Amino acid sequence: MRSLLNCLKITTDMRHILIIGAGKSTGVLVDYLLKKSEEENLKLLIADKNIDQAKLLSQNHKNADAVELDIFNEDQRRAYVQKASIVISMLPARFHIEVARDCITYGKSMVTASYVSPEMQALDEDAIKKNLIFMNEIGVDPGIDHMSAMQVLDRIRAKGGKILLFESFTGGLVAPENDDNLWNYKFTWNPRNVVTAGQGGAAKFIQEGQYKYIPYHKLFRRTEFLDVDGYGRFEAYANRNSLKYRSVYGLDDILTLYRGTMRRVGFSKAWNMFVQLGMTDDTYVIEDSENMSYRDFVNSFLPYSPTDSAELKMRHILKIDQDDIMWDKLVELDLFNATKKVELKEATPAKILQKILEDSWTLQSGEKDMIVMYHKFGYELDGHKKQIDSTMVCLGDGEMQTAMAKTVGLPVAIAALKILNGEINTPGVQIPITAPIYEPILKELEDYGIRFRESEMEYLGYNPLSL
């Protein structure tokens, strides 16, 4: 590892950006800043526990250095933070707080793409006192969803309109040209988040003034359908708490507020089979999981029978026939393979299911992903009810320039540079929901193909028959 002193050499005219975490979305972030590094006098220090990954992202560029960093090594971490002009944390969300406390200590502004945790929010007063900007939730979801929604909401309100409905959906999916399995899905981000999605409490939202709740075991059978021009029909299941941003968005009196996750039609019904069987459970460990075959794993959730096969028992439990597309989807995953081993010690059902799915759903070299976002706004203005649909589709450009990496990394990078240049200057722990923040960032994102298309029509209200 390069010595600490060598990496902390600075020149007075360079502005130093410390980037902690060299994960999937950091490459796009680094690319953006390196292209700006000459005109903006930027020097990047990419720090990660995997020095090889950090070096790869640095591209041997004269304005980028890579270092190995153990985030739990306080002396090392603080030394890097102390010398930075601004800090970007691309770490898993649970580790941001240690970096944030260092930033308070040494007077550094900070940017993350993660949700604001209670611990992060508790630093708001200290950040304001020190005139520091702690920008969070500036990836894609959360991030671009906030900015694009607030842009339309503020525009409607500026005209005197009253917001009646707001629905927002985002999905990380496989690009159409690589959509080649029966599930119409491949992992484009953290597989664990997909397997455990919806757990931890009932989904909560408002429809036509009524609070609605969907428990986990019903979540994937209560879906909304939506169409995106040029990309066909999608479905969406409810996020856990659609009401989290009601006050933040200024929607306390809204009649319908619903946020969800997008998939291709048919995914949720098929995924519900795993939920009903218990395969997505992450609360207990399967005995002797290391030596189980995939077939053993499936059989462990089925009743004992001295005569019936696992396949027959599965179809009976799920009430599906052999010629049902749901059955074909299960068979496609090679779930009943008696020779493939789980090879995971003390694994939960969710972890085992994740491994099985990764065999089939991992993006291969050359395959591309896609981010789809859909907002629906219902409002009343001058006695007329209208609706705006706003959609965004971003396609990946390969393994290092995935759609997910672009839509996470670019807004983080743009925000960091604007903070560094004083264009974003309101201190405190915050998210990008004010016009001085979202307007210039959304405008610049259009240069990278991340743009929203709007259509306006008469608003007919939410269908009361579905309540």
Model-found features: residue ranges?
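Rossmann-fold cofactor-recognition segment
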Residues: 60-73
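Helix N-cap at the beta1-alpha1 junction of Rossmann-like dinucleotide-binding domains, i.e.
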Residues: 49-52, 117
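C-terminal catalytic/substrate-binding lobe primarily of soluble NAD(P)-dependent oxidoreductases
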Residues: 158-467
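ADP-ribose/adenylate-binding Rossmann-like module
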Residues: 102-120
